[in-house]
């Protein structure tokens, strides 16, 4: 594989990662599909995916840096507030949202690793799509928490319970948390914003652990490829997050669910038939 070819693969996969990581469509499903089509699979590919995920995480940090610093009591200028009441999102909300998935993830780590195969990803894409549709149909007409600062401790914990579904590869962490948020009375926009904020510590922890385990597959010769993938994922994720938050004010998640079914069909056609 030539250097130019590697850089093209890095750019394409960085584009896919940045576009899908925070949308409720499953980045895992897309990376499996595209990686297979490009012939980029194996230990090096898995390590590359871990590295470019850090680019996506950085996009969230840049997008919500003021809010993230506020969670730990560091404020720059006016303190952001998005809600109809006097409540405020705190670090406790984030911790409550993390606990269920962290506990289940640690207890079932080995079993979860066995789920990383195309067939399980295909099923997760379908079930996650059904959950998105259910969230749209069953959500309260008037959400109890229209803004992210209205989210209660109970709602944060319940969203965290839904996040456990994302331990199933292909389910989509954002899809699980946003759907869960809507079902417990959080508005579509606020649930999406909370999902992004919750992603930072969750993904840093998971990605950091995966990167540590993958250090043996890293070499300086791969630096240009990994750098291109990282930067591409960062830029595309930044654009994707801004666009997504703008779009969901106007449309439901049902189109995303339908798209998931299409991706599941593609996985079936490529890996099962």
UniProtKB/Swiss-Prot annotation:
Protein's gene: uppP
GO biological process: cell wall organization; peptidoglycan biosynthetic process; regulation of cell shape; response to antibiotic
Note: Bacitracin is thought to be involved in the inhibition of peptidoglycan synthesis by sequestering undecaprenyl diphosphate, thereby reducing the pool of lipid carrier available.
InterPro entries associated with the record: UppP
Membrane-topology descriptor: Multi-pass membrane protein
A molecular-function term among this protein's GO annotations: undecaprenyl-diphosphatase activity
EC number(s) stated in the UniProt entry for this protein: 3.6.1.27
Pfam families (UniProt xref): BacA
Domain of life: Bacteria
Membrane-crossing segments per the record: 7-27, 45-65, 89-109, 115-135, 152-171, 189-209, 221-241, 253-273
Homology family: Belongs to the UppP family.
Principal EC category: hydrolase
Task of the protein: Catalyzes the dephosphorylation of undecaprenyl diphosphate (UPP). Confers resistance to bacitracin.
Reaction(s) the record says it catalyses: di-trans,octa-cis-undecaprenyl diphosphate + H2O = di-trans,octa-cis-undecaprenyl phosphate + phosphate + H(+)
Subcellular location: Cell inner membrane
PANTHER family: UNDECAPRENYL-DIPHOSPHATASE (PTHR30622:SF3)
Gene Ontology CC, one term: plasma membrane
Protein known as: Undecaprenyl-diphosphatase
UniProt keyword list: Antibiotic resistance, Cell inner membrane, Cell membrane, Cell shape, Cell wall biogenesis/degradation, Hydrolase, Membrane, Peptidoglycan synthesis, Transmembrane, Transmembrane helix
Main localization (coarse): membrane
């Amino acid at each position: 594989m030539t250097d130019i070819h590697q850089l093209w693969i890095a750019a394409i996969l960085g584009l896919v990662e940045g576009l899908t990581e925070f949308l409720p469509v499953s980045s895992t499903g897309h990376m499996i599909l595209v990686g297979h089509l490009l012939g980029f699979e194996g230990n090096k590919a898995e390590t590359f995916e871990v590295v470019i995920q850090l680019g996506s995480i950085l996009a969230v940090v840049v997008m919500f840096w003021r809010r993230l610093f506020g969670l730990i009591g560091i404020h720059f200028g006016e303190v952001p507030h998005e809600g109809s009441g006097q409540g405020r999102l705190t670090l406790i909300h984030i911790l409550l949202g993390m606990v269920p998935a962290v506990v289940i993830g640690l207890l079932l780590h080995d079993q979860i690793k066995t789920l990383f195969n195309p067939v399980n990803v295909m099923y997760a894409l379908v079930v996650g799509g059904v959950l998105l549709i259910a969230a749209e149909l069953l959500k309260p007409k008037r959400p109890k928490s229209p803004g992210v600062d209205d989210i209660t401790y109970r709602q944060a914990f319940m969203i965290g319970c839904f996040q456990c579904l994302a331990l199933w590869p292909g389910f989509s962490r954002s899809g699980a948390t946003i759907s869960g948020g809507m079902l417990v009375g959080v508005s579509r926009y606020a649930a999406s914003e909370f999902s992004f904020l919750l992603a930072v510590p969750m993904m840093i922890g998971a990605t950091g652990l995966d990167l540590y385990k993958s250090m043996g597959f890293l070499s300086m010769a791969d630096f240009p490829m990994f750098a291109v993938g990282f930067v591409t994922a960062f830029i595309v994720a930044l654009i994707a997050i801004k666009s997504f938050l703008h779009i969901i004010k106007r449309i439901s998640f049902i189109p995303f669910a339908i798209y998931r079914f299409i991706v599941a069909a593609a996985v079936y056609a490529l890996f099962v038939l």
